[in-house]
């Protein structure tokens, strides 16, 4: 198993190095995104030459290390951040997350697409991109290629928004105040990295509020995973009643750990440098998980998924950009 873990760690080191390149930084591709790309390149070139004894190590990275990474992600948040941003941003976040996930599941049914991919794509679009998809993947036990397909859609449309929002704001197409633009950016962009990139391009006043609003969405991962677990358990119970084989339910204890870490971090007991070091370690662990998932994803599996995941992601993207804009513009004035 050790060989597989070391292989993924090596790829993750490469992802960190590439992520520091000026071009990669300019498009705000996090090491996690670079990692899954490297993993997919490996899957479609040298994967067949991998010794079978290395596979358990790769699976360990995509499951166990993933959960540790999600728990440590809590060191990026405090409950004080949530209180500072106020009721309007929290309400907008709740609406965005609820409509995106529920709407995505419904659209997935209309498109007659794979339920797992529809759920992962919806959660990724609604909450925090790749990290949310990884958390949900661990809960519903989706196949690695489904996770990779969902992550790909999030990366594509999130990257488009990262360049689109600053362009629209600078050229006067967004009739929003700086506070509203911060809420709009944080509530509708997919990845944390996308929010950071877009916020920096529009100024510190927007960037700071956008990041906090985004982090509130990240915190919503916990209730979403718990609700998902409950619904999956109910669905599998019905399958057993119909005579089908029982499938074990994965209780997302790591989500509880994530919230516990947020609570601990809210007391500000650790030095800032130590927290920064933990966050760097956490990014590396999540990069290992993403890379491991990428190594299980071949082009053939993308072909198997078809165009429907991208159609769903596009529809959700239109909702986030257009629906999110009108929510922020017309709802926040009544709440502030």
Curated annotation (Swiss-Prot):
Q: Which GO terms describe its cellular component?
A: plasma membrane
Q: Where in the cell is it found?
A: Cell membrane
Major subcellular site: membrane
Recorded hits in InterPro entries, A to Z, give: UPF0324_pro (IPR018383), UPF0324_YeiH-like (IPR004630)
The Swiss-Prot or TrEMBL record describes its family as follows: Belongs to the UPF0324 family.
* NCBIfam families tied to this protein: YeiH family putative sulfate export transporter
Name assigned to this protein: UPF0324 membrane protein BT_1919
Q: Which organism is this protein's natural source?
A: Bacteroides thetaiotaomicron (strain ATCC 29148 / DSM 2079 / JCM 5827 / CCUG 10774 / NCTC 10582 / VPI-5482 / E50)
């Amino acid at each position: 198993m050790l060989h597989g873990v070391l292989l993924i760690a090596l790829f993750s080191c490469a992802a960190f190095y590439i992520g520091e390149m000026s071009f990669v930084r300019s498009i705000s591709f996090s090491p996690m995104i670079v990692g899954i790309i490297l993993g997919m390149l490996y899957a479609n070139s040298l994967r067949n030459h991998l010794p079978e004894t290395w596979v358990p190590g790769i699976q360990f990275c995509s499951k166990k290390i993933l959960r540790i990474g999600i728990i440590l992600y809590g060191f990026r948040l405090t409950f004080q951040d949530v209180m500072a941003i106020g009721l309007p941003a929290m309400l907008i976040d709740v609406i965005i997350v609820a409509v995106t996930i529920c709407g995505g599941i419904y659209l997935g049914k209309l498109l007659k697409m794979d339920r797992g991919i529809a759920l992962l794509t919806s959660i990724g679009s609604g909450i925090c991109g790749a990290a949310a998809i990884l958390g949900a993947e661990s809960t519903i036990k989706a196949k690695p290629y489904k996770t990779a397909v969902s992550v790909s859609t999030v990366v594509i449309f999130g990257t488009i928004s990262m360049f689109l929002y600053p362009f629209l704001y600078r050229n006067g197409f967004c009739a929003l105040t700086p506070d509203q633009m911060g809420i709009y950016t944080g509530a509708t962009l997919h990845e944390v990295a996308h929010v950071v990139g877009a916020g920096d391009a529009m100024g510190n006043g927007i960037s700071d509020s956008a990041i906090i609003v985004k982090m509130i969405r990240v915190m919503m991962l916990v209730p979403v995973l718990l609700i998902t677990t409950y619904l999956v358990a109910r669905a599998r119970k019905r399958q057993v009643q119909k005579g089908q084989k029982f499938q074990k339910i994965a209780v997302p204890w790591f989500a509880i750990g994530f919230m516990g870490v947020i609570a601990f971090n809210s007391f500000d007991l650790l030095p800032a440098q130590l927290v920064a070091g933990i966050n760097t370690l956490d990014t590396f662990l999540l990069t290992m998980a993403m890379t491991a998932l990428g190594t299980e994803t071949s082009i053939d599996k993308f072909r198997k998924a078809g165009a429907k995941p991208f159609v769903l992601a596009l529809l959700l993207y239109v909702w986030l950009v257009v629906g999110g804009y009108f929510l922020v513009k017309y709802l926040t004035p009544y709440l502030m």
